[in-house]
Amino acid sequence: MRVIAELPHPDFKISIFSMNQKFIVKIERGILEQSYKISEMDITDGVNSVFELLDEEFLATVTARFKEMGSDFKSAYNRYN
């Protein structure tokens, strides 16, 4: 797996990898991460098409999902302690 690109974002780290004819978009925020696999066959303009997928609407959804994930993890952690 090799790093193709890292995109700046104020709230999280976005990395794009290439592995086995797939692009893997990894988005990290603190201890949490989300990853998305996209077949190279499904997009027409290589990594540039991946950049286009990462629009503001998608990133807003990612932000909301991180909040949900954090809440879920905190609840599980509190049940443990």
Predicted regions and their residues:
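N-terminal acidic leader/helix
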Residues: R2-K37
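Mixed-charge, Lys/Arg-enriched low-complexity segments
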Residues: I43-N81
